[in-house]
């Protein structure tokens, strides 16, 4: 799929010849291709983002119903959009007019008079965290725009409109938003032309769009992906050969900050999620085939997720519109879970079970206060009664807790006829999660606040808050305010822990032997969410990120792995049940998603994390007719799949050494609970993990007698200031203390250089990169290239090498597959023993020879920019 099919061949030649762009400055202004409007980043994170916003009467949304942004030439763009509700069309010509300015020539054509409308135009949203440094945005006189920063000192940015607009104002309830309205109160028929000029100071770079950086080739000409979704293009099943069946070493247990099997063998898990419809609508034969494929791809853990979710039909309860309650499990659905467990177990793959994800309660579940619970719009049970969400409310409603316990009894006590074991008695079950993404400390405490219609749940919450405040001498009016730091974070942790401990005690009484996880820290939770999680045996975390994760400057900006690292509590194993990119939209994947797997795997091994699960392998059934493109379907996405096996090798085999130095952030109780501390606002959390292993020490806290103070590791460097940076102020890259990992955020480049794995990831085009035994010279702007030994010998001695190649891949219209895959252009040189041959796999999965030359002890592989394979085998 391409938005540039009309670009002339002459222009294409010019653009493709341009060197790939990496950013020379920390501050970067560019055009957001989804809007055709300016955006400003600082260290890779958004500092200002602009969006069109229009409103009909009474602030009812009336945004564009169609639009198209196009790159006409380098730094020259056009934009067209239609607003049917308000009856006007918008066109814009956009260009870089000086080295420090971008200009928009807006042409608005209103077709009829509209009255009694709020109007609209452009909303500029600023990062409030930068107000300390930049100040708040200022309005230019006479409705002409706004400025931000200090013109004399810089950085400084200004957006000026001519002629003046109908209204430019700072949103009264959000001083981080400036609204610049083209129309206000009414729309008169006719044309108006408006010039907008974005001017930036020295030190702010005007950069190309994402598409320009990648190159504006016609993606419809890319070759179609040839990967078979039923078989694996590589075979790493040897990693599981000694573990069949899963559970042979006994139950998994948490020992200090590590996972072990019962026989004392260390346990590390590289996993994924099989979710929703994939669980219940896949045939038994295909489940067996996918279990074998998962093993061949290098996985040894699968989380069975969204088994109970309201939007999945059937779920573990059956079809929600055909049942009257959720007190009984569907025999047909249980059979599918049984078979998944059996097939995965046979392949040496362990299983992670969730007890609650998005279960919807029903009227006949006999929940006290059911009428008060938020309902799932448009969804009903068999009696046509609405169904309700339980998140947050389970902490203050014992009838919800009781029904969750009842589910656990049925689910974990169910005897799998294929294994003759109840789930609770099966050592192939690695861990159990009580409730998914359901914390009070950062999210669902807000559901219980008294600004809602008074209910028995809110009254219960307020009574508990008052009692906690009285018991511990805290300010009553501060203790219930869930959105604030201070006494509320103490109370919310305590309330969450009470429920967690009750559930843990119940599960242990049922006979659950494996580690129990309460819920996850997720959704930009701060460190004050961690204490309640220590009730469980593991700390679990979720993290998702957008494009350009390698370009995030840790001195100023957070990326996906920073949030994972900030959950590592001293003395506790760390699991990651969800990590991934986020698609830019429902139909547009993140272009550089091929960079993520190796980055996460190498970081995880360096940090010493214990279990990682990519989200997700699939949410759709494994059927020929269901093969769609999605962020949640790695199984058929060549851009994700390309490097997942390589990442499995890095992590499971220990190709990357663990950090030699530990850095422990040890906040006092006052620091932890009375202020926001997270990767978003702590430079220590971001920079420490670049230098060594990051751990969080939790303090003794009188109001939380159940919270055990962390025992500080003997050789760790202990730091108490969250604002202390461990990198120089002008740093542009960091190397691990082992010397094996290097990230240059200015160049958007990450390398792994070890005896068994050598990889280069990110903006590789136009550079010559040399690692221990490989040399890479690509014309393709961005890619991931990994060379790995499969026989356990160092690369230069190995006689069996895997080469993994990741590039962009785009789905066909309407999210159809197969994807079109960007062909690699350039050369790869590998120092290795003589006598090896190079192979690729054809569409039938058969090996076929691939051209390669050998001279002076090196193999030279040429990529022609026309054909593409994601895996090569030198053996």
Go through the PLM ranges and name each one.
Residues 499-516, 528-724:
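Catalytic-core region of carbohydrate-active enzymes that cleave or remodel glycosidic bonds
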Residues 107-174:
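Polysaccharide-binding surfaces and accessory modules of carbohydrate-active proteins
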Residues 55-60, 70-73, 82-84, 115-116, ...:
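Beta-strand-rich recognition/accessory modules
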Residues 251-256, 260-262, 266-536:
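Active-site mouth of glycoside hydrolases
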Residues 25-84, 91, 214-228, 278:
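Acidic-aromatic substrate-binding/catalytic surfaces of carbohydrate-active enzymes
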Residues 787, 857-875:
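C-terminal beta-strand-rich structural cap/linker in extracellular carbohydrate-active enzymes
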Residues 8-19:
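Bacterial N-terminal signal peptides
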Residues 795-834:
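Proteolytic processing hotspots in large secreted/extracellular or virion-associated proteins
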């Amino acid at each position: 799929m391409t938005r540039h099919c009309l670009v002339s061949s002459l222009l294409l030649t010019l653009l493709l010849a341009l060197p790939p762009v990496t950013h020379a400055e920390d501050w970067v202004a560019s055009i957001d291709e989804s809007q055709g409007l300016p955006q400003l980043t600082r260290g890779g994170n958004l500092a200002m983002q602009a969006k069109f916003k229009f409103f009909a009467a009474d602030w009812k949304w009336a945004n564009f119903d169609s639009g198209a942004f196009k790159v006409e030439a380098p730094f020259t763009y056009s934009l067209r959009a239609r607003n049917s509700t308000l009856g006007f069309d918008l066109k814009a010509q956009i260009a870089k007019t000086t080295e420090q300015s971008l200009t928009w020539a807006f042409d608005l054509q209103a077709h009829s008079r509209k009255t009694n409308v709020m109007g609209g135009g452009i909303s500029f949203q600023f990062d409030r965290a930068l107000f300390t440094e930049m100040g708040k945005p200022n309005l230019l006189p006479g409705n002409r725009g706004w400025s931000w920063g200090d013109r004399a000192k810089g950085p400084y940015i200004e957006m000026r409109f001519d002629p003046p607009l109908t209204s430019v104002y700072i949103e009264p309830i959000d001083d981080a938003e400036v609204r610049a309205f083209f129309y206000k109160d009414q729309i008169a028929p006719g044309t108006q032309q408006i010039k907008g000029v974005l001017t930036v100071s020295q030190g702010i770079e005007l950069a190309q769009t994402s598409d320009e950086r990648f190159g504006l080739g016609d993606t419809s000409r890319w070759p179609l992906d040839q990967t078979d979704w039923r078989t694996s293009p590589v075979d790493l099943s040897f990693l599981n050969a000694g573990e069949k069946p899963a559970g042979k070493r006994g139950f998994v247990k948490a020992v200090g900050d590590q996972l072990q099997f019962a026989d004392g063998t260390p346990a590390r898990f590289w996993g994924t999620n099989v979710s929703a419809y994939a669980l219940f609508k896949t045939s038994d034969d295909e489940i067996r085939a996918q279990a074998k494929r998962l093993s061949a791809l290098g996985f040894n853990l699968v989380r069975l997720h969204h088994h109970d979710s309201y939007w999945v039909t059937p779920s573990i309860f059956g079809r929600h519109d055909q049942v009257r309650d959720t007190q009984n499990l569907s025999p047909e659905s249980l059979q599918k879970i049984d078979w998944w467990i059996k097939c995965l177990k046979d392949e040496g793959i362990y299983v992670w079970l969730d007890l609650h994800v998005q279960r919807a309660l029903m009227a006949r579940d006999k929940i006290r206060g059911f009428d008060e619970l938020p309902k799932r719009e448009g969804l009903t049970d068999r009696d046509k009664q609405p169904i309700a969400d339980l998140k947050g409310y389970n902490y203050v409603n014992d009838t919800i807790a009781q029904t969750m316990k009842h589910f656990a009894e049925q689910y974990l006590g169910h005897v799998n006829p294929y294994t003759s074991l109840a789930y609770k008695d099966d050592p192939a079950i690695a861990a159990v999660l009580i409730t998914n993404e359901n914390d009070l400390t950062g999210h669902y405490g807000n559901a219980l606040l008294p600004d809602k219609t008074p209910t028995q749940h809110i009254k219960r919450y307020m009574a508990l808050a008052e009692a906690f405040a009285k018991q511990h001498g805290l300010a009553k009016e501060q203790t219930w305010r869930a959105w604030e730091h201070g006494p509320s974070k103490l109370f919310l942790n305590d309330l969450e822990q009470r429920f967690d401990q009750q559930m843990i005690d119940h599960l242990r009484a049922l006979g659950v032997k494996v580690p129990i996880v309460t819920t996850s820290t997720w959704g930009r939770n701060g460190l004050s969410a961690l204490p309640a999680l220590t009730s469980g045996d593991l700390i679990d975390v979720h993290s998702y990120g957008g494009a350009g994760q390698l370009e995030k400057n840790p001195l100023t900006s957070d990326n996906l792995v920073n949030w994972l690292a900030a959950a590592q509590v001293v003395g506790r194993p760390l699991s990651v049940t969800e990590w991934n990119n986020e698609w830019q939209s429902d139909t547009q994947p993140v272009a550089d998603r091929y960079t993520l797997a190796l980055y996460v795997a190498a970081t995880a091994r360096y940090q010493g994390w214990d279990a990682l699960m990519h989200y997700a392998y699939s949410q759709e059934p494994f059927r020929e007719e269901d093969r769609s493109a999605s962020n949640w379907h790695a199984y058929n996405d060549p851009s994700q799949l390309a490097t997942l096996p390589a990442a499995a090798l890095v992590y499971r085999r220990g190709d990357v050494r663990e950090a030699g130095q530990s850095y422990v952030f040890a906040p006092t109780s006052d620091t932890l609970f009375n202020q926001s501390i997270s990767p978003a606002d702590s430079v220590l959390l971001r920079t420490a993990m670049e230098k060594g292993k990051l751990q969080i020490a939790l303090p003794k806290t009188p109001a939380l007698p159940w919270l055990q103070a962390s025992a500080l590791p003997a050789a760790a460097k202990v730091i108490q200031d969250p604002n202390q940076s461990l990198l120089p102020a002008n740093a542009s890259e960091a190397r691990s203390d082992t010397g094996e990992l290097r990230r240059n955020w200015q160049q958007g480049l990450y390398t792994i250089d070890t005896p068994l794995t050598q990889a280069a990831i990110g903006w590789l085009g136009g550079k010559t990169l040399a690692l221990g035994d490989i040399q890479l010279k690509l014309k393709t702007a961005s890619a991931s290239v990994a060379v790995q030994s499969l026989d356990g010998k160092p690369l230069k001695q190995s006689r069996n090498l895997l080469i993994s190649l990741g590039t962009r891949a785009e789905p066909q219209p309407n999210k159809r597959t197969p994807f079109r895959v960007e062909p690699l252009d350039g050369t790869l040189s590998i120092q290795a023993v003589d006598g090896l041959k190079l192979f690729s796999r054809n569409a039938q999965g058969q090996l076929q020879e691939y051209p390669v030359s050998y001279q002076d002890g090196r193999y030279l592989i040429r990529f022609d920019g026309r054909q593409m394979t994601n895996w090569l085998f030198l053996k």
